[in-house]
Amino acid sequence: MELTTRTLPAQKKIALVAHDHCKSMLMKWVERHKALLANHTLYATGTTGNLVQRATGLNVNAMLSGPMGGDQQVGAMIAEGKIDVLIFFWDPLNAVPHDPDVKALLRLATVWNIPVATNLSTADFIIQSPTFSDTLDVLIPDYPRYLAERLK
């Protein structure tokens, strides 16, 4: 597949997602980085977003809850270039009924080459990166070219 460049803006659009057993960990992480996150636009699946907003006072654009379609809403935003970073604390020790949605969300984040953190260490690496609040060019699929090839 041919690639093109997308520039992630200095003010990132960050999606926050956490499975039930990981929500408190995400809350503590957001609280720890609240001052920096306040400079960015936050999105989240429903329950997570409402909990983060209530706990921190940060403005969070909440989608539906993950099992009700929120993971897919976030995935669609990634595919549309409307999410720049995904912080997704998922629970590897407990199965969730919407596991196919989880896999699809992670697949889309990989396809569209956005930074993804699935644990505390990676989330800290991303947010503490010197480039976190700068613009950043990333390679993404050249969808118009992909579509043109498929329609030949």
Curated annotation (Swiss-Prot):
Gene, per the UniProt record: mgsA
GO molecular function (one): methylglyoxal synthase activity
Keyword vocabulary terms for this entry: Lyase
Known role: Catalyzes the formation of methylglyoxal from dihydroxyacetone phosphate.
Similarity field: Belongs to the methylglyoxal synthase family.
Binding sites annotated in the UniProt record for substrate: H19, K23, T45, G46, T47, T48, S65, G66, H98
Entry's Gene Ontology BP terms: methylglyoxal biosynthetic process
EC number: 4.2.3.3
One protein family per Pfam: MGS
Family matches, as PROSITE patterns: METHYLGLYOXAL_SYNTH, MGS
Coiled coil stretches, renumbered: none
Catalytic activity: dihydroxyacetone phosphate = methylglyoxal + phosphate
This protein's GO CC annotations: cytosol
Residues of the active site: D71 (proton donor/acceptor)
Organism: Cronobacter sakazakii (strain ATCC BAA-894) (Enterobacter sakazakii)
Domain MGS-like as annotated: residue spans: 6-152
Organism classification: Bacteria, Pseudomonadati, Pseudomonadota, Gammaproteobacteria, Enterobacterales
Protein name: Methylglyoxal synthase
Keyword set includes Magnesium: no
Top enzyme class: lyase
